[in-house]
Amino acid sequence: DFYEMYPEKFVNITNGVTPRRWLLDCNPLLAAFITKKIGKQWITQFQEIRNLASFANDFDSQKEFLEIKKKNKQALFECLQHTNPIRDSTGKPVGHYSFLDETALFDVQIKRIHEYKRQLMNLIHVIMLYHELQENPEARRIKRMVFIAGKAAPGYEVAKQIIQLSYCISRRINQDSKTNQKLKLVFIENYNVSKAETIIPAADLSEQISTAGTEASGTGNMKLAMNGALTIGTEDGANIEMHQQVTDRFWPFRFGKTTLENDLIRHTGNYNPWDIYMQNNSIRKALDSLRDQSFTQTEEEHQALSNLYQSLLHKQAGCIPDYYFVLGDLLDYYRTQKKVEELFLKPQEWAEYALQNIAAMGNFSSDESIKNYAKLVWDIQPCLVDPKELEKIRIEYSEHDKCRIFPSSVNGSIKNSS
């Protein structure tokens, strides 16, 4: 009915995030670097961030960016040492994580735990890397710290099993002296905005790996890119528009089938994950470890991991196996992760790509979203704000901002407690 009355108001407006919180506030070191390079106009006119591209190929700017990233990684270490204990199978804290150093790739997937977001694919890849390193500790030339964070809906059993799998894998691989100098996994518990504000500035790689055609948009991908993380992702949600802005040249880690390809597979029924399992030894070994008690200590854990194995390979309760094509995209994901490693071995080039990604994020500010709503939907014009009124609101907002749960740190990466 509303569409018949106002068809012109039914338009697609891209999501955005505020660069004041998700860059200026949460990453003061990077914000100061940007201001030094291009001035402070970007803070309120985020399209100005495009001017950072002219520094992307500058050696000194690349070096400074990489040093900032290392400092933010150290801030994340300090945060997790106090807020993220190692837990046993009953959930009891039994110690604290030891981390790889700041030269490691920080591989980050932070979002709601859901099958379509495919944390499970990320974890299977971690198992594959672990098996490779067990056979040959020199199989990988970079160090990788994998961080996963998110919450599961209260009644979503499979999502909770994915969290259990994360804990089981991290417990095993982090204690394996043969591999733990090259690979570690941390599940960050009780994920919230305050923790995101410390994780995001430290990220090197942003995992945006949902099954193409399932993500409406997403904003975590924008926050991570604004802070200089490169995206490994499918053509899904806002990844598509980000890819267009960044261009193919600086978006090297695209992988996976498209929405149209996935729709065709579902329509024809031409997908059998069992064939993939049988034809690839590395995948088969990784999946078999979900049911052979390689990672479990209790029967409850064994049952949870066995259920995940079954969901990927066997029809259950009328649902087709591997509904979100985890195995269907896994090999392409694995190959693309090798491209990640190759680029990470060239830090100056990696920094150039990261700075180009930041510079391309102008369209993904919430200011831009609001401007487009005002123009295309609300039909209202911008008006000047009284500076005194603005300052009053800023003070009131600061006084009532109760979301900060971490104490202040020297570099400002961990926020003040209110």
What spans do the regions from the language model cover?
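Structured aminoacyl-transfer and RNA-binding surfaces used for tRNA recognition/handling
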Residues: 1-2, 6-14, 21, 27-34, ...
